[in-house]
From Swiss-Prot:
It comes from Listeria monocytogenes serotype 4b (strain F2365). It is found in: Secreted, Cell wall. GO terms for biological process: cell adhesion. This is Internalin J. Keywords: Cell adhesion, Cell wall, Leucine-rich repeat, Peptidoglycan-anchor, Repeat, Secreted, Signal, Virulence. It is a peptidoglycan-anchor. GO terms for cellular component: extracellular region. SUPFAM superfamilies: L domain-like. The modification Pentaglycyl murein peptidoglycan amidated threonine is found at residue 889.
Length: 916
């Protein structure tokens, strides 16, 4: 019986060794009925079986497959093996997920062997290149925080997640990744990002590239998160992103942002742009909003009832209404100098309030019991009451104007967290008394404990603690202010009080009037009035008066202002000088002399008086302004103008007729006075020509009626000419429809060429301009087709999986030219189908022609290598996956060994039965 068992065991072993396929099937049976291996003993017991599952092909250690030791270790760990263990290429292809982040990897060579990968995480390494052309099953790729300068993901058509953040990429092509839902290419040096083919994106992050000037996300209708901050984008259209929940576009050059369609937004940061207005009233779900560092003057947040955070730092807002934002927790308006008032009494949930450098002068914090952080530096606040803010942990109000800090002491935690240096207080202006000034120290200067603060006078003042006053002596208005400082005991509060002062107002003296008269008491020049304070000196001065000499300088030419008005009189004598004559003329309104001129003579400064004359038939119409005046050193003319007495004349009738006497235009009637001149004028009458100018077209009105007749002759009908304009190429092919122009024979014509797309004018005809004549004329403009280099056509030779089988070809040409791509003969492959665009025309867009081949099927395959391999530490589940692969069609099977095994087994069974 024992011998029989040994024989049967030997036969079975021989059969299994002779037929590995049977061994593989047996292994599957074991795995299917076994749970996950948990003990060293179990692993050891399965190693011989795993060892037999290694497929035929190259087998070497992980260190051999992967030159980078750190990478080799990470891949080995994924198989729960050591880097020195051996593994086949087929087994490497079974790995589906690899996380080798933060492993100091510099070289990813060998990644191409992991063709089964669907997920790869290689973040936080020192990788400079990453070739994933063979990893076409990847759906998840995270390669951020490396040193990549180039990343080609075009073969990864199944990719749904891509994170290449924090590298050195200057470009990224995701046009072949239509399934992407997540894309993070932030912190690179991209100048553009085209996501027009990625319509499934829900998250896009391209911030901190600093060079992107435009971004089109209109195709991304599923987008929920967008971060394009820290770039140079000037315009952003999010009207099609109606599912957008988070938008961060800060630190760009955006001038306009329309958010009317983005009503699901909860987070919005558009700070540091160039927005002059923004409408957020439709965004009722918004909880976070930052519009800081924009030239905004208005902002309506009344509909944002869910808002918890609002930042409007360094804007030009004139006001901000927070009464509807009752959930507000964080509010910052730092640098908003134009905001003078702020009501936070409705914001009972406030945790942080920052109004530094705002223009507010008062602030009611009585309704903010949850306030923890309060920043009021560089404000115009003069009062502060935090007695209701018992949870305050930090208060800073440096460089304000606050005197009383007693409310702070009611919150013990603030005693060591109060910063109130640099307070400046300006008191009302005081008046000096004998160059001295005494002022009372402000009783409102109280520290956080309600105690008076320590006082230190400046500018040489003396402090009297008993009277709480400070006195300054010998003050000068050259420095018209005095100061003193105040300090709390713990030094948290420091400030300066400034009191401006002025000298007593002086008493005004009565005015001094200075007169300038001749020796007859006549005024020669305007008086001067001198003003000043009582007892101040005054000085008067004489004037230079033409033709007069000063003869008397008054004794009181200088003196002092008194309580009585004073007069100072300078007396002059006229100089005797013969003047030029004054000529008096008498003329009509045409300048014609009507009577002899008169000549008046005298001395410079003397008065002259001209008189009019009575002239028969004329009436004086103009009395000259200088009829009375003063003789001087220049000759003068006085002209009296007369008008002839008017006698109405009979009218002159002007007719416009043809040679038969037919009226062609309404008559004109000319009226005037007897002796006046009339001038009749001809009219332009369509279709007629004036025959002759009448002899009496010009004449004088008389006491008799007169008639002037303009006679016209009818014009003959004009003869017309035609010019036809053609637009052709150098082969006389018509490029545009011909046009015609017509006109009167003898008139000039001008033609113009047309702008024809794709063509340039080469010949302007000599007769482009000319004269219409009785014959039809032809003008022909000749054009030459433009030669424009087209974008290339790339011809690829690939298998059904997109794998390159032969080098691509590049076809070049001119736009409009025809291209012809050709297939290649590739050993072991057959062309599946001729691409539809194998022949076409070059255009201004790059084109791709793909020849797709099918691998030929080999009938005869070599027998598998029977060499044994080292035991594997693969998990049972992974061994099962590898063993599920059946022989491919055409693989040879060791049937002879199988039949021999069956025969021997049968023979042994018969012998055993006989012995039994």
């Amino acid at each position: 019986m024992k011998t029989s068992k040994i024989i049967i065991a030997s036969l079975v072993s021989l059969t299994l060794v002779s037929n590995p396929i049977l061994t593989f099937a047996a292994t599957n049976d074991v795995i299917d009925s076994t749970t996950e291996i948990t003990t060293d003993k179990e692993i050891s017991s399965t190693q011989p079986t795993i060892k037999t599952t290694l497929k035929a092909g190259q087998t070497q250690s992980f260190n051999d497959w992967f030159p980078d030791d750190n990478f080799a270790s990470e891949v080995a760990a994924a198989f729960e093996m050591q880097a020195t263990d051996t593994i086949s290429e087929e087994q490497l292809a079974t790995l589906t997920s690899l996380d080798c982040h933060n492993s100091s990897i510099a070289d990813m060579t060998g990644i191409e062997k992991l063709t089964g990968l669907t997920k790869l995480i290689c973040t936080y390494n020192n990788i400079t290149t990453l070739d994933l052309s063979q990893n076409t099953n990847l759906t998840y790729l995270a390669c951020d925080s490396n040193k990549l300068t180039n990343l080609d993901v075009t073969p990864l058509t199944k990719l749904t997640y891509l994170n290449c953040d924090t590298n050195k990429l200057t470009k990224i092509d995701v046009s072949q990744n239509p399934l992407l839902t997540y894309l993070n290419c932030a912190r690179n040096t991209l100048t553009e990002i085209d996501v027009s083919h990625n319509t499934q994106l829900t998250e896009l992050d391209c911030h901190l590239n600093k060079k992107i000037t435009k971004l089109d996300v209109t195709p991304q209708t599923q987008l929920t998160t967008l971060d394009c901050s820290f770039n140079k984008i000037t315009a952003l259209d999010v009207s099609q992103n109606k599912l957008l929940n988070r938008l961060n576009c800060d630190t760009n050059n955006i001038t306009k942002l329309d958010l009317n369609q983005n009503i699901q937004l909860t987070f919005l940061n558009c700070s540091s742009n160039k927005l002059t207005e923004i409408d957020v009233t439709p965004l009722t779900q918004l909880t976070y909003f930052d519009c800081s560092v924009n030239p905004l003057t208005e902002l309506d947040v009344s509909t944002l009832s869910k808002l918890t955070t609002l930042h409007c730092i360094q804007t030009d807002l004139l006001e901000i209404d927070l009464t509807h934002n009752t959930q507000l927790i964080y509010f910052q308006a730092e640098g908003c100098r134009k905001i003078k008032e702020l009501d936070v009494t409705h914001n009972t949930q406030l945790y942080l309030l920052d109004c530094q450098a705002a223009g507010i002068t008062e602030l009611d914090l009585s309704q903010n019991p949850k306030l923890v952080y309060l920043y009021l530096n560089n404000t115009e606040l003069t009062k502060l009451d935090v007695s209701h803010n018992t949870k305050l942990k930090s208060l800073s109000c440096v460089n304000a104007h606050i005197q009383d800090f007693s409310s702070v002491g009611k919150i013990p935690v603030l005693n060591n967290n109060l910063d109130a240096e640099g307070q400046t207080i300006t008191m009302p202006k005081e008046t000096l008394t004998n160059n001295s000034l005494t002022i009372a120290v402000s009783p409102d200067l109280l520290d956080q404990f309600g105690n008076p603060m320590n006082i230190e006078p400046g500018d040489g003042g003396v402090y009297d603690q008993a009277t709480n006053t400070i006195t300054w002596e010998n003050l000068s208005t050259d420095n018209p202010a005095v100061t003193y400082t105040f300090t709390s005991e713990n030094g948290a509060i420091v400030g300066t009080v400034t009191t401006p002062f002025e000298a007593p107002q002086p008493i005004k003296g009565e005015d001094v009037t200075v007169h300038y008269l001749d020796d007859k008491g006549e005024k020669l020049a305007a008086d001067e009035v001198l003003s000043g304070n009582l007892d101040d000196p005054y000085t008067s001065s004489a004037k230079d008066i033409p033709d007069y000499t000063l003869t008397t300088t008054p004794d009181n030419a200088t003196g002092t202002f008194t309580t009585t008005s004073q007069s100072v009189t300078y007396v002059y004598t006229k100089n005797i000088v013969a003047a030029e004559p004054v000529t008096v003329n008498y003329v009509d309104d045409t300048g014609k002399t009507l009577a002899p001129s008169e000549t008046l003579n005298g001395n410079v400064g003397d008065t002259y008086n001209a008189t009019a004359k009575q002239i028969d038939g004329y009436t004086l119409s103009t009395t000259p302004n200088n009829a009375t005046g003063t003789f001087n050193t220049s000759s003068q003319t006085v002209t009296y103008v007369y008008t002839k007495n008017i006698v109405a004349a009979e009218p002159v009738t002007v007719n416009y007729v043809d040679d038969t006497g037919k009226t062609l235009a309404p008559s004109e009637t000319l009226n005037g006075n007897v002796g006046d001149t009339y001038n009749a004028t001809a009219k332009q009458i369509d279709g007629y020509t004036l025959s002759a100018e009448p002899t009496n077209a010009t004449g004088q009105f008389t006491s008799s009626a007169q008639t002037v007749n303009y006679i016209y002759t009818k014009n003959p009908a004009p003869e017309k000419g035609v010019v036809e304009i053609h637009y052709v190429d150098e082969n006389n092919k018509q490029l545009s429809s011909a046009t015609k122009i017509s006109g009167t024979v003898g008139d000039n014509y001008t033609t113009e060429p047309k702008n024809i797309d794709g063509y340039t004018l080469t010949t302007t005809p000599d007769n482009a301009t000319g004269t219409f004549n009785t014959s039809s004329q032809t003008v022909t403009y000749v054009y030459t087709k433009n030669i424009v280099a087209a974008e290339p056509v790339t011809v690829n030779y690939v298998d059904a999986n997109g794998k390159t089988l032969a080098p691509s070809e590049t076809l070049n040409g001119t736009i409009g030219d025809t291209y012809n791509a050709t297939a290649k003969q590739i050993d072991g492959y057959t062309l599946s189908a001729e691409p539809t665009n194998a022949t076409g025309q070059f255009t201004n867009s790059a084109q791709t022609v793909n020849y797709i081949y099918t691998k030929n099927t080999n009938i005869d395959q070599p027998l598998p290598d029977k060499k044994t391999t080292k035991p594997s530490n693969l998990k049972t589940t992974e061994v099962k996956k590898a063993s599920d692969t059946l022989p491919k069609t055409g693989d040879s099977t060791p049937w002879k060994s199988a039949l021999l095994g069956v025969f021997l087994s049968s023979t042994a069974l018969v012998i055993w039965k006989k012995k039994k």
